[in-house]
Amino acid sequence: MLYIYMHFPNPDTVTGNLIFQVLDKTVEMSSEQLHKLFTKHRSEFFTEIAALLKLNFIVIVDRYIWSGLAYAQADGITIETKDTFKPDYTFFLSSNKPLKEKPFNIQRLFEEKDKQEIIFNNFITIMNDVPKNKFCIIPAHLNKEIIYNIVLTKTLKVFDNNSCLKYIKMYDDKYLNVQDLNLIDFDWQKCIEDNNDKEEYDDNNFIV
């Protein structure tokens, strides 16, 4: 089993580095501009994720589309969701500990206590709309090794229960026909198909 771990924002890209500067408050940007930047940043990795899935990798992504939605909704902003994949399985680390607000001079953007509570509630609302067999809530206070084993066990179960990859479901309910994806010219746009009575895909690769 091969897997790749990604996280957003990624400081190794120009867009990701700019996002970190905004979060650290060294660069000013409106909320709408920032969320558009986050959306652009996720889209930048579309081809990489598609290629990895084509090559039978499991792709584990920290802070992907659900995070984008939860944070944008906290600012009352609707974001573009095309060119993102719908997670096949989601792990949500939840804590019942009171949020501790950092001193203002070292706070990053979004780290105010009130804002964090709104974002947390947004996550709960989003998770309520995710099918129960496609997500797992993990208490964040558990030992890291226990969390790792939970993630590994659940991931292997999903992996073992699925068969060969043909389509990757995208967030807007379109499908990427990964079977026809050519890794040489990689013109993935022509592989996007509408959901016209297409059966739910089965795959042995998934975004967590």
Curated annotation (Swiss-Prot):
An annotated Gene Ontology molecular function: dTMP kinase activity
Pfam families: Thymidylate_kin
Single Gene Ontology BP annotation: dUDP biosynthetic process
Alphabetical list of InterPro entries matching this protein: P-loop_NTPase, Thymidylate_kin-like_dom
Family per record: Belongs to the thymidylate kinase family.
PANTHER family to which the protein is assigned, alphabetical: THYMIDYLATE KINASE (PTHR10344:SF1)
Role description: Catalyzes the conversion of dTMP to dTDP.
Protein name: Truncated thymidylate kinase
